[in-house]
Design a protein with these regions (language model features):
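Non-transmembrane, aqueous-exposed alpha-helical and coiled segments at domain scale
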Residues: 1-231
Length: 231
């Protein structure tokens, strides 16, 4: 990081911050903010709890997973071969590649199915940045995966909800082209989302009167009690 940047680089970082600033009250870290705020705790504790949620790779750390998945892909196959890319994506779903989690990172969203509107904005700008940075081949690979992944997931899953590239799919690519280290991706997300967390905390303070205490149903199958002497 030299401190020098082009107008396009500044525009994309600004866009990424705006798109990550708020995304409703149901996402994990913002819901955490509501829950912790309802206990009556202070602002610092509520934001610290939200940060703990955002740190998770299924939430704020997802774009790091995307970048590392693509690094593994480039080290494992000929990424100019569409069949090889399709095979790698299938291997991901079969838990045979990368971290063997059975996921194609950056594809699919808990809310969006047809498209993530944030991803669409980043995708268009990422193309311009790739041209400026000489990263057209890498952008083409991302575009190929964005096209192939929904088709491969549809073939693999019996119950299928439409999927598409999400905001994490392109944000990691943009940060990488901006020469930002992976260790800063989640802190940048936090810098933006603290705006949303703060707004939701104020909403909870002004409108709620009771502690949030949802009912809980265990997801683990019921097991018969086994006396200690028989264990």
């Amino acid at each position: 990081i030299t401190g020098e940047y082009t107008p396009l680089e500044a525009k994309l970082l600004d866009l990424a911050l705006v798109l990550h600033a708020e995304h409703g009250g149901g996402n994990n870290s913002t819901f955490t903010t509501h829950v912790v705020t309802s206990s009556g705790t202070d602002t610092y504790s509520a934001i610290a709890a939200a940060l703990g949620s955002l740190k998770g790779p299924r939430h704020g750390g997802a774009n790091i997973k995307v970048v590392r998945m693509f690094e593994d892909m480039k080290n494992s196959i000929n990424t100019k071969d569409e069949d090889a890319v399709a095979g790698y994506l299938t291997a991901l779903l079969n838990r045979e590649a990368f971290d063997k989690a059975g996921l194609i990172y950056g594809i699919g969203h808990a809310v969006y199915s047809e498209s993530d509107p944030r991803a669409g904005l980043l995708m268009d700008c990422a193309a311009s940045l790739a041209a400026e940075k000489g990263c057209e081949e890498e952008y083409a690979l991302y575009s190929l995966v964005a096209r192939l992944a929904p088709e491969i997931i549809a073939k693999k899953r019996k119950m299928y909800k439409g999927v598409s590239a999400n905001v994490d799919f392109y944000s990691g690519l943009i940060y990488r082209m901006l020469d930002l280290p992976c260790e800063l991706y989640t802190p940048i997300f936090a810098m933006a989302r603290i705006v949303g967390w703060s707004a939701h905390r104020l909403e909870e303070l002004q409108n709620a009167g009771k502690i949030i205490r949802p009912a809980y149903i265990g997801v683990k199958p019921i097991q018969q009690y086994l006396p200690i002497e028989d264990r």
